[in-house]
């Protein structure tokens, strides 16, 4: 469903109340990765250039409904000032709502930016309390949601406030929806998805929804072990979910009945311990000995998956192929990242480890769309409606 965007508003003299995702990693008060701040810059710049005063709000970390000094947004304000020299002023406040926030918002002039304090310091945020939503709405004239990464949460700053102001999408939100919904609703075929990660139980809804849409589904990571177990293979000491075996069998049957290629590893990298310096070897999935565990996909599987990916026209990848955090077992994930970069079609990567692999290998510019939202992109892949998106005005 198409939503209004910041292009649909005359911003001259208006205050834009913008929900961004500035949930950045901090170490000793220093930002270690400012990707999420940079991702919001196109929206902020557009608003400033079109005569708006810009009020930004975000959560940071999990302060559990109280003020936590180490989770204040002051480091974000400082970084934003470095990244946005064209702003007439960039101000911070230790208030999110109430008289101090209202006074700061009233004083804000076109071309200036105000960063409100961490929304999750207020217990009403995660409860989606109407009183907080109304107080936030007092601060601006139009609400902009550019926080796709929080769009699956119905909080006061992501969903509640949209009931009390005109509500539109920012550029990041627009790009995420266009890429993911476009791929799911109108893909150029062949349409392939690669799903990895540790557990089937986390991705049942995603796989079920995709089985009605894709031409091929490639499975890796720990979840592949449970599918292999469902097919009768001995999995040694591998991570498996015995309770999910019936679900795995059901998904395999559904794929077969719908003519979807459901690809599982044919060879794997096994180790005798969960450790980077463990003994390891490559075996066929039928030859996993007792006491050994699967920690990555093998080279034969990499070749088969690579061929499917590089000949596809639409590919979505979410989740690692192995224990990506241990270097000897990161090869499968890295190989899939390379295959994605070599695919000429529409390529979309989401999920922390998948994105990290692409970025570590310097391949980010070869991927058409890198999703900023882990949980939000998974819920879209499940076919769910995201509260933060549903709350925006229809185009």
Swiss-Prot record:
ATP binds at residues 203, 325, 351-354. Keywords: ATP-binding, Cytoplasm, Glycolysis, Kinase, Nucleotide-binding, Transferase. This is Phosphoglycerate kinase. Pathway: Carbohydrate degradation; glycolysis; pyruvate from D-glyceraldehyde 3-phosphate: step 2/5. Its EC number is 2.7.2.3. It comes from Roseiflexus sp. (strain RS-1). Its main location: cytoplasm. It catalyses: (2R)-3-phosphoglycerate + ATP = (2R)-3-phospho-glyceroyl phosphate + ADP. The gene is pgk. Monomer. GO terms for molecular function: ADP binding; ATP binding; phosphoglycerate kinase activity. One of its GO terms (biological process) is glycolytic process. Gene3D superfamilies: Phosphoglycerate kinase, N-terminal domain. GO terms for cellular component: cytosol. The keyword Kinase applies. InterPro entries: Phosphoglycerate_kinase, Phosphoglycerate_kinase_N, Phosphoglycerate_kinase_sf. PANTHER family: PHOSPHOGLYCERATE KINASE, PHOSPHOGLYCERATE KINASE 1, CHLOROPLASTIC-RELATED. Belongs to the phosphoglycerate kinase family. It is an enzyme of class 2 (transferase). Substrate binds at residues 21-23, 36, 59-62, 120, 153. It comes from the Bacteria. It is found in: Cytoplasm. The keyword Nucleotide-binding applies.
């Amino acid at each position: 469903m198409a939503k209004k965007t910041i292009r649909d508003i005359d911003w001259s003299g208006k205050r834009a109340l913008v929900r961004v995702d500035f949930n950045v990693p901090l170490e000793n008060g220093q930002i270690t990765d400012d990707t999420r701040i940079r991702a919001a810059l196109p929206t902020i710049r557009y608003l400033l250039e079109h005569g708006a005063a810009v009020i930004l709000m975000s959560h940071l970390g999990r302060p559990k409904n109280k003020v936590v000094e180490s989770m204040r947004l002051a480091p974000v304000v400082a970084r934003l000032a470095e990244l946005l020299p064209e702003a007439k002023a960039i101000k911070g406040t230790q208030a999110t709502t109430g008289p101090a926030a209202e006074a700061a918002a009233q004083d804000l002039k076109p071309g200036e930016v105000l960063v409100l304090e961490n929304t999750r310091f207020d217990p009403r945020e995660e409860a989606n309390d109407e009183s907080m939503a109304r107080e936030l709405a007092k601060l601006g004239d139009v609400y902009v949601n550019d926080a796709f990464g929080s769009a699956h949460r119905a909080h006061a700053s992501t969903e509640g406030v949209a009931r009390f102001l005109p509500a539109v999408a920012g550029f990041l939100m627009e790009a995420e929806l266009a890429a993911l919904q476009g791929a799911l609703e109108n893909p150029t075929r062949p349409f392939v998805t690669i799903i990895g990660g540790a557990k089937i139980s986390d991705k049942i809804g995603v796989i079920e929804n995709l089985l009605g849409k894709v031409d091929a589904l490639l499975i890796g990571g720990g979840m592949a072990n449970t599918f292999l177990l469902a097919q009768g293979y001995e999995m040694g000491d591998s991570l498996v979910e015995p309770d999910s075996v019936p679900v795995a069998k059901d998904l395999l049957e559904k794929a077969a009945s719908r003519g979807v290629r459901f690809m599982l590893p044919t060879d794997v990298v096994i180790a005798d311990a969960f450790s980077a310096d463990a003994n390891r070897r490559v075996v066929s999935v039928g030859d996993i000995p007792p006491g050994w565990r699967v920690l990555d996909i093998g080279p034969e599987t990499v070749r088969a998956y690579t061929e499917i990916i590089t000949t596809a026209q639409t590919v979505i990848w979410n989740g690692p192929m192995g224990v990506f955090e241990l270097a000897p077992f990161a090869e499968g994930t890295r190989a899939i990242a390379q295959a994605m970069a070599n695919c000429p079609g529409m390529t979309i990567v989401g999920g922390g480890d998948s994105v990290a692999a692409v970025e570590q290998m310097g391949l980010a510019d070869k991927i058409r769309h890198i999703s900023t939202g882990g949980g939000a992109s998974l819920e879209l892949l499940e076919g769910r409606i995201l509260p933060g998106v549903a709350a925006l005005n229809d185009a």
